[in-house]
Amino acid sequence: MIGRSPGSLVETAEAAQRRRRRRAWPPALLVGSALVLVTFLALPVGVLLLRAIQPDAVASLALPVAAEALRLSIVTTLISLAVIIVGGTPLAYLLARYEFRGRAVLDAIVDLPVVLPPVVAGVALLLVFGRRGLLGEPLADAGLTVVFTTAAVVLAQVFVASPFYVRALKVGFAAVPRELESAALTDGADQVQAFLRITVPIAFPSFVEGVVLAWARALGEFGATIVFAGSLAGRTRTLPLAIFAALERDLDAAVALSAVLTAVAAVMFLVVRTVSRGRF
């Protein structure tokens, strides 16, 4: 065996140390960059929550305006959610289990509200349901007005939130093995029984995820609502619009209402994470 000289051993050790330094540098850079972004994301929310627990902010939640906005948000989002479930469930099943001409186009239409700016969505709804819109004019002739009413709030929420429900439930339906449904039919179950006994239990976590995501999106809707429904206290001023209105006259109320939405968003996030990890 040929031994190495002390000089070569020193050079080898120095080279190994340099390699370790090179390997150690990228993780340090990654951690530093990540820390900057995480701080940027967490700091505003933390300051908001700290400000929200101040006595003046807490007291503002008892104001009639705050209670009215909260009530309107809950009522409209629950109605919107019911509409989304009734219309979105068969649509999600259709997209997940059937191949047909035009399926890609239908899929793209479902995704469109996600990428469409909310203000643009409001303008589009206005062109359809406004007093001189495609459907709004004949409705107005029949004595029915949609724009700047609570119904307009619901329509705006349904428009922007539907894709979140359909997308989540589509994934759940697609994950159901067809063999299980076929076995249920072979055992004597009809289509409805197979759907209720096999498909629904397997897709249920995706259903919960879709409901939570759609409800959270509807609850936070602002742009389409203010364009299409306006900001009328007691009629169309939901929580996001009440926050915007309060910024001009009562910062404490805006902070408190913002904290309420933040808390709801946090709960919704935890529910989605729990369901997605299979711990429901």
Regions picked out by a protein language model, each given a short descriptive name:
Residues 1-24:
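Short, Lys/Arg-rich, polar N-terminal cytosolic tail immediately upstream
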Residues 21-55, 64-174, 198, 202-223, ...:
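Membrane-water interface segments at the C-terminal ends of transmembrane alpha-helices
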Residues 101, 179, 189-191:
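Short coil/turn motifs that cap or connect alpha-helices
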Residues 184:
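The alpha-helix within a helix-turn-helix
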Residues 187-189, 201:
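Glycine/proline-centered hinge or cleavage motifs at structural transition points of membrane proteins
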Residues 213, 227-231:
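Short, glycine/charged-rich beta-strand-loop motifs at protein surfaces that mediate ligand recognition
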Residues 232-246:
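Short hydrophobic, aromatic-rich alpha-helical segments embedded in or entering the lipid bilayer
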